[in-house]
């Protein structure tokens, strides 16, 4: 049921107005489409809107739980410098008055940046706030169009027909838990990082943190300031100590949990703990999307998709912005949005459905040949020097290199690809995340590169369209 798009404006729905949805709305409007954004909350910002509220189930497995969509903890700071985080024509620079001036600012500064972006490009005029999308499905009258059913916070329901739907609902709301034998009988308290806000509940406790990626590292050190002991369970064990924290230890993965409150690690170490914090990531989740099986989620692979964006059988009527994780997220949202907008207008053509499917299947086969698990399908970065993918060879980078991906999309839609300075700054920054120690955000030696970056920023004109 692949749609045939001729060159004209389309009526497009965008679901979710976080960093992906905001730039999607802008790029769709720039391409001449009429756009309506659906946002369940009162404000733009998505992931970056902090709240003290958490799910009613601390590990978020109860299907009937009260769901809170924010996963931000109070102490969160960015793990990339602001200079490489922003959209191409709207630099994320220090605000002149209020805000956090640090290069690795806190979440409030990122939210203010997104709010400034929405204001600058008058995006809020196209948003229906406090409106939850309940169902997206082919229109019964015309299966080349899409029916969107929604409900506002005051209980009023409605539906509308669109030529296309762009899904930007993020992937940091539905927690994923690792399988740990015996965990169901372990007597201590458990929480997923989705529901972590402050360290106070762990005062004087022995805490095990499962996972050592960005949130795991942040939460471990946050809790270490107040807990008796913190033990990190990590797949990437380099040493058993961590930075300047005497009460923090690193262990390999967990072998099993026991009813007596102990946890056994794979190196034989046994720890009696009061609490476990699961920093084990999230699942892609689209409860509103009804595609009759044309799009599925299996072990965190959303597929089949052409270039992480278009389901071949439904393209271009359905598209996804922001599925790949890691990498330069805001820039990726922007360039994917340019591609989707230009495809919908007919300015850029997609291959035939069978060709897109062939390429998707070939991509999945390549990942399988390399031994890359399905859950890393949307991992978009250069694996060289990245311990998450430390077993892969440099020549495998072509499979998942974000630079190649950005360059390919830029060529399709005739826009500027990733700037050399942004790529260089990211490559330096991502190594610091893994190898820079617990104070990497406040130590850097890239002054010369930053001078180059700000010279490039100075060339931008206000409200400049960098796609032209």
UniProtKB/Swiss-Prot annotation:
Function: Catalyzes the conversion of methylthioalkyl glucosinolates of any chain length into methylsulfinylalkyl glucosinolates.
One example GO MF annotation: NADP binding
UniProtKB keywords: FAD, Flavoprotein, Monooxygenase, NADP, Oxidoreductase
Residues the record lists as binding NADP(+): 211-216
Residues that hold FAD according to the record: 16-21
Alphabetical list of Pfam families matching this protein: FMO-like
Similarity section: Belongs to the FMO family.
Gene Ontology biological process terms in this record: glucosinolate biosynthetic process; response to jasmonic acid; response to salicylic acid
Reported cofactor(s): FAD
UniProt KW Oxidoreductase keyword: yes
Superkingdom of the source species: Eukaryota
Protein name per Swiss-Prot or TrEMBL: Flavin-containing monooxygenase FMO GS-OX-like 1
EC code(s) of this entry: 1.8.-.-
Alphabetical list of SUPFAM superfamilies matching this protein: FAD/NAD(P)-binding domain
Major enzyme class: oxidoreductase
